[in-house]
Regions:
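Gram-negative and organellar
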Residues: 1-353
């Protein structure tokens, strides 16, 4: 029962709270549709699929590229990919630059990643992608380092209102301990984000992804990395303070659906006798809290060019708590001998945050 109520409150048409209000004091003809909607479930909100992607890397040029699709089998699928260039400003320089152009899936929720359907009404929406560019400059002299980055993206999905994102961040870190096979760093990081529109919700027309109008985060990150002859691992953590400010938003992003809901709310208000109202908007909110993250990754050389690796992570670095994990097996066609990388460079899915 709890799961059904939670789902009805998050997805699709009239939610459970609205329906209870309407049906508690029914207005006959105008509420017949609401009655029908509330009598049925929204359908299962889960999905599965198989992602496909190919990638190319030329380390001597600092060039990387990939092309693929969001998982086939999802309700909504899209082409995704990107290209990046990471090089020093001059040979043997401590200064570097990174340029990245990409189209990526927004994986904050099932709605934003795979899309959703309300079985009561038949409406489908979601499957959001972010297309944009990002640039970074950095300095590292093996005693300390600093970086500055900026990015812009346009976000779109099926029957989802378009949005734009701007981000800016910087940080500094120090090598607290460093030798050939181990390294400890600590520092400070500051990041900021702005979205034109609050698309954080799950009703029809919303994207279901974190999209505050103001987001600021100040963190204290630490990282420990170590390697042996055939293994390498890294543990990372960060704790700090974050501030989130989100505008209020209409219950539906579709103008026709929102207009119909507002008309129904006005009719209810004119006839209700208990003083209750039918909400048609999500409330604005601002909050400050503690942000944290913890992650670990590692890789083992099995021999004959094969490597086994994995990664785990948890964080509340936005407005939700997230747990991630992955395991991979990769094969290198080139010579796989020599020292293991420090820090480890685990495989990253094109769909990872």
């Amino acid at each position: 029962v709890h799961e059904a109520a939670s789902s009805n409150a998050r997805f699709g048409g009239f939610n459970a709270a609205q329906g209870e209000l309407l049906l508690a004091e029914p207005l006959a003809e105008q509420l017949s549709d609401a009655d029908a909607l509330m009598s049925d479930g929204i359908g299962k909100q889960k999905d599965r699929g198989v992602g496909l992607a190919v990638a190319y890397e030329k380390p001597s040029l600092g060039l990387k590229g990939d092309l693929g699709s969001t998982p086939l089998g999802f309700r909504e699928t899209s082409l995704v990919g990107g290209i990046s260039l990471d090089r020093p400003f001059a040979e043997n320089s401590n200064f570097r630059y990174n340029l990245n152009l990409s189209r990526r899936a927004v994986v904050d929720s099932l709605l934003s990643f795979a899309g959703a359907k309300d079985a009561r009404t038949g409406v489908e929406w979601g499957g959001v992608t972010a297309s944009g560019l990002r640039g970074q400059i950095s300095f590292d002299n093996q005693r300390y380092g600093t970086y500055l980055y900026a990015g812009w993206a346009s976000l779109d999905g099926k029957n989802v209102e378009s949005n734009e994102r701007v981000e800016l961040g910087s940080g500094i870190y120090w090598y607290l301990f460093s030798n050939e096979d181990a390294r400890l760093t600590g520092g400070l990081s500051l990041s900021a984000q702005h979205y034109d529109d609050n698309q954080s919700f799950y009703t029809y027309g919303h994207g279901g992804y974190f999209s505050p109008q103001s987001f600021f985060s100040l963190g204290v990150p630490f990282s420990w990395a170590q390697r042996g002859a055939n293994w390498s691992y890294q543990v990372q953590s960060s704790v700090g303070v974050q501030y989130i400010d989100q505008d209020g938003a209409p219950y539906y992003r579709d103008k026709g659906a929102q207009s119909a809901l507002e008309s129904l709310a006005a009719t209810y208000a004119a006839n209700a006798t208990d003083g209750r109202v039918l909400n048609t908007r999500y409330a604005a909110q601002s909050k400050t809290g503690i942000g944290y993250s913890l992650g670990a990754s590692g890789e083992v050389r099995l021999g004959d060019g094969f490597f086994l690796g994995g990664a785990l992570g948890m964080d509340n670095a936005r407005d939700y708590r997230q747990y991630t994990g992955g395991l991979y097996l990769r094969y290198l066609f080139d010579d796989a001998g020599g020292a293991m990388p420090l820090p480890v460079n685990p495989y990253r899915s094109p769909y990872s945050n």
